[in-house]
A protein has these predicted regions:
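Structured-RNA-binding interfaces characteristic of tRNA pseudouridine synthases
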Residues: 1-211, 215-303
Length: 303
């Protein structure tokens, strides 16, 4: 029977989906786990061959097997054999010969930008950091020119082996998500008494008695109205999500679109220049290729 898997993974530590001469890949880990589980050599075939460092919530893969295990049960047993950064979210039986790569589909990618004055180490694996105060309104206007059926040669890595660079983007959205203010020092001052001053001062007093403070610090003492002044942040902490849906994409197309829109956001490219960039069919006209860390394949719809 033929089985299709819905696969999610953190691509940070992998050399992409497809098996490579050197470096660990998602496909390799799936093959190893399935071969061990089913007792026969298994080779999966993926729908989207994501690049090194790119993540997925919903990539698809198919394989053929003679196992008697019900297809819908394979995911449970398989996850026991996979690394923690790869998970199969569903498994199901599909018709022999079916492959999502050759079916009519719409894929959705999200590119995450952490826009702040300083990087956040907890977001480092899944978003791209920039301290430029991005103009989201300008980015949205620029994105509107990219929707539709176009020749996206300007948004494709030079040397890509494809018959045509014409593709269709069905939808593109740009959303802002404010970062939880509870995790930030706000623009106002922070008072020690606002963070359980009694407990805090008790801990400080203990440290003073144990000799962790200088003589000058001990003589100065600690007051419950001590105030730490936090300078105002230059930009608002936020996550900007570029969401792109289409029937197919060129090599690095979404990352180049994201890089171009960030150039628009910081004022290096004017939104009205986008039609000319498309018509120019010249990779040098578009923005840089955004880093892989911010890109996630989030949805795969079979029509």
């Amino acid at each position: 029977m033929r089985v299709m898997l819905q696969v999610a993974y953190d691509g940070t530590d992998y050399c992409g989906w497809q098996i490579q001469p050197s470096g660990v890949t998602i496909e390799e880990k799936l093959n190893e786990a399935l071969t061990e589980l089913l007792g026969e050599e298994i080779k999966v075939s993926g729908a989207s061959r994501t690049d090194s460092g790119v993540h997925a919530l919903c990539n698809l893969a198919v394989f053929d097997t003679d196992t008697k295990i019900p297809a819908e049960k394979i995911s449970y047993a398989l996850n026991q054999r996979l690394p923690r950064d790869i998970r199969v979210r569903a498994s199901l039986k599909v018709p022999d010969g079916f492959h999502p790569r050759f079916a009519k589909t719409v894929k959705t990618y999200e590119y995450s930008i952490y826009n702040s004055q300083f990087p956040d180490p907890l977001r480092d694996r899944y978003s791209f950091f920039t301290y430029y105060d991005l103009d989201v309104a300008a980015m949205k206007k620029a994105a509107s020119f990219l929707v539709g059926k176009h020749d996206y040669a300007s948004f494709c890595t030079v040397g890509s082996q494809v018959e045509s660079t014409v593709r269709t983007i069905t939808d593109m959205e740009i959303d802002e998500r404010p970062v939880d203010e509870a995790l930030l020092c706000a623009n106002a001052g922070v008072f020690l008494k606002d963070v359980n001053a009694g407990s805090f001062l008790k801990d400080v007093t203990t440290c003073m008695n144990e000799g962790d403070f200088s003589k000058e610090q001990k003589n100065a003492g600690i007051r419950d109205d001590m105030k730490i002044e936090i300078p105002p942040r230059r930009i608002k902490d936020r996550e900007i999500i570029i969401r792109v849906s289409g029937t197919g994409f060129l090599y690095n197309m979404v990352r180049i679109i994201a890089g171009t829109l960030m150039e628009v956001g910081r004022g290096a490219i004017v939104p009205d220049e986008i039609p000319g960039i498309i018509e120019g069919r010249d990779r040098n006209l578009a923005g840089p290729t955004a880093p892989a860390c911010g890109l996630t394949l989030v949805k795969y719809v079979i029509l």
